[in-house]
Structures are given as structure tokens and as C-alpha cells.
A protein has these predicted regions:
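Gly/Ser/Thr-rich phosphate-binding loop
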Residues: 129-184
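AMP-binding/adenylate-forming core of the ANL superfamily
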Residues: 198-220, 224-226, 232, 286
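Conserved C-terminal "lid"/linker of ANL adenylate-forming enzymes
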Residues: 282-284, 297-340
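AMP-binding/adenylate-forming
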Residues: 47-54, 70-125
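Active-site glycine-centered loops adjacent to acidic/histidine catalytic or metal-binding residues
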Residues: 38, 119, 146, 169, ...
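Conserved AMP-binding A3 loop
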Residues: 30-57, 64-66
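Conserved pre-ATP/AMP-binding loop-to-beta segment of ANL
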Residues: 15-34, 67-70
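AMP-binding/adenylate-forming catalytic core of the ANL superfamily
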Residues: 224-306
């Protein structure tokens, strides 16, 4: 049984943890999890406990975690990422440190955990507070998942003294099946799959995953990928995040990556219907004031057909419960704004 080491006595996280432990020990072969809903409506699915245990062993073995190491639970337990932190603790004998899920997971922690799994937003926020940044630097094994790690965040982590990893996975793979190092001499833009995982590209150029330890089915993802001769891969974007504007295909993630260094506020690229172009590239941004030179700034870094035809200031960029940009909500919001 997990024995939580809890720095702050918040009953809601305790109740959620106990509910999951009760479900885990109820004698049934599966537990329920919820997908993030980043590309559409969140879905509920049942996953096998034995495969969650297999996933936990893959991660703990890869990272070299030891029995008795502390593991920080700082993500909601309705999603696979939070559940897998608990399962790793159960399977590997880790000491679970529980905090209320928030944008500042280290705010109430006195001592850095040995192992922590966070989303990019939590890492970014922690870097902004000196005390939290120092604790983050002391985490011996930090994995970051649930969203892309942009170049600026990767640069901020590059000189960390301990291992920092970006993970690749999804609910269907029970958290991650591949990692890439973000700091030190091993830093790379290529993900390395676990030894038991096989990957290839579909005819669409999307990543196909064969990971029998965590899913009995071969999974074809919507992630457009590139493979190298070492069996590694990198993600170029999602097939459903491609905008076809006047016959030119624009990958949303690539456009956002070029804009990120020059836009110091939250933003998202999407598309709205256009009579002439089919789809028009559209930018939503959450700045405190209007940005009259925004289009020119975009033109300075984007090819002509990638540049937004519309820019709309919004109160906030819609996100899912796990902190990802909610692409479906962003697109719907842009369509409403375009209609006036």
C-alpha cells in the first residue's frame, strides 16, 4: 500500500488518491481513465492494470529508480499521467509525496523529490520562482509530458545538474513509450523508444507504435513523424493540425514554434473557413492590450502563406484539464470571432 508523504493536508487530493487505490485493489482487471481532450471531446476508457504495471516497470528501470526513492504526485488523478505516478510507486516501492495539482507543484514542498513528472506549464511556472527553481534543479529524475517542450523551455533546462527528459506517449500507451534527453551531453531532439517498443511510419507519414507490453493493439497515431537510422523519431506535428490554405499545407505546431520566441504572451494558431483560400490561418492571442504591429511581427518570421489572415485578442487561450491547448475549443472560438 502506498504511504503518502504529504506536505500540505488538502483533503481533495487525499480523497482522489484513496479512490484510485480502492479501485486499484478492487479485484477487477481494469481501471477507468480519461483522455485529455486536446483535439476533441475527452473520452473515458478502461485500461488493464497488468499493462499499467508493465509500463511502470519500463519507466522505473529506464531511469534507474530505487526502492524508497520519493516520487511527487502533482497531477490530477483522472488522467493517466497522475495514475501512473501512483502505479510506479506501488510497483517499485517508491515513497509517494502528494501535493494539490496546481501550476506551482513545488510551492508547498520542503525537499526536492527524487522523481517528478510534470507538464510543461508546471515546469515553466516553477522556473519563475527562485525557491521553486532551486527545488526543481535538485530533482534527480524529471520527466516532462502532456505537451510539447518548446525551445525556450528546453534552453532554460539545459544546464540542470540532473537528468531532465521530455516524454512521448498518450493514454492508449499508458503514459510514455519513448523519451528524449533535454540537458547535458545527451540532449537531443530525437525520442528513443523503450527496447520493447517498435515504431514505423504509416502511408500518411504518421507514427505507428507496436508496444505489446502496454497495448495489445498496434496504434496508428495522428502524429506526423520522422525516423532516423538509429530507430529514433521526432514529431513534426499532428495530421489533424494541418491547415490547407490556398493549396499550401501549414503545420500548426511548426508555425507556433517560429512565433514563440517573438510573442511574449499566450497564443494559438488555428484556421477559419475562407471562401477563397478554403481555410485562413488565424491567430488567437491573450495579451493585456491590442498589438497593432502583430501582423508585421508574424511576417518577419513566417513564410507568406503561413502568416495569419486574422488576429483576435482573447481573454485566455482555451486549455484542457491537463494543461494542453484545446485545439477544438480554439478553433470554435476563432470561428465565432470571425463571424462577428
Amino acid at each position: 500500500m502506498v504511504q503518502p508523504v504529504t506536505p500540505s493536508a488538502r483533503p481533495d487530493i487525499h480523497a482522489a488518491l484513496q479512490a484510485f487505490l480502492d479501485e486499484w485493489h478492487d479485484g477487477r482487471p481494469t481501471v477507468g481513465v480519461q483522455t485529455s481532450g486536446s483535439t476533441g471531446t475527452p473520452k473515458h476508457m478502461q485500461v488493464e492494470k497488468c499493462r499499467m504495471e508493465a509500463s511502470a516497470r519500463l519507466t522505473c528501470s529506464f531511469l534507474g529508480l530505487q526502492r524508497g526513492d520519493t516520487a511527487l504526485l502533482c497531477m490530477p488523478l483522472q488522467y493517466i499521467a497522475g495514475k501512473m505516478v501512483v502505479v510506479r510507486s506501488l510497483v517499485w516501492g517508491l515513497r509517494l509525496v502528494t501535493v494539490q495539482p496546481s501550476g506551482h507543484p513545488l510551492a508547498d514542498v520542503d525537499e526536492a523529490p527524487v522523481f517528478a513528472a510534470m507538464i510543461p506549464m508546471q515546469v515553466y511556472n516553477s522556473l519563475q520562482v527562485p525557491r521553486e527553481r532551486e527545488l526543481l534543479r535538485r530533482v534527480k529524475h524529471l520527466i516532462i509530458g502532456g505537451g510539447a517542450v518548446d525551445d525556450s523551455l528546453a534552453r532554460a533546462l539545459r544546464d540542470f545538474p540532473h537528468a531532465v527528459w521530455s516524454t512521448y506517449g498518450m493514454t492508449e500507451t499508458l503514459s510514455h513509450i519513448a523519451l528524449r534527453r533535454l540537458n547535458g551531453e545527451e540532449a537531443s531532439e530525437w525520442y528513443t523508444p523503450f527496447d520493447s517498443v517498435r515504431i514505423r511510419l504509416s502511408e500518411r507519414g504518421t507514427l505507428v507504435i507496436d508496444a505489446p507490453a502496454v497495448n495489445r493493439q498496434t496504434l496508428e497515431t495522428n502524429d506526423i513523424a520522422e525516423l532516423n537510422e538509429r530507430g529514433q523519431f521526432r514529431i513534426l506535428g499532428r495530421a489533424d493540425n494541418t491547415i490547407n490554405t490556398g493549396g499550401v499545407k501549414v503545420q500548426i505546431e511548426q508555425a507556433e514554434a517560429r512565433l514563440a520566441p517573438i510573442l511574449p504572451f499566450p497564443f494559438a494558431v488555428t484556421a477559419v473557413p475562407d471562401a477563397r483560400l478554403g481555410e485562413a490561418v488565424t491567430l488567437l492571442y491573450a495579451a493585456q492590450s491590442e498589438q497593432p504591429d502583430l501582423l508585421q511581427r508574424c511576417r518577419d518570421v513566417l513564410p507568406p502563406y503561413w502568416c495569419p489572415k486574422h488576429c483576435y485578442r482573447v481573454a485566455s487561450i482555451p486549455q484542457t484539464g491537463s494543461g494542453k491547448v484545446s485545439r477544438a475549443e480554439v478553433k470554435e472560438l476563432a470561428r465565432r470571432l470571425a463571424k462577428g
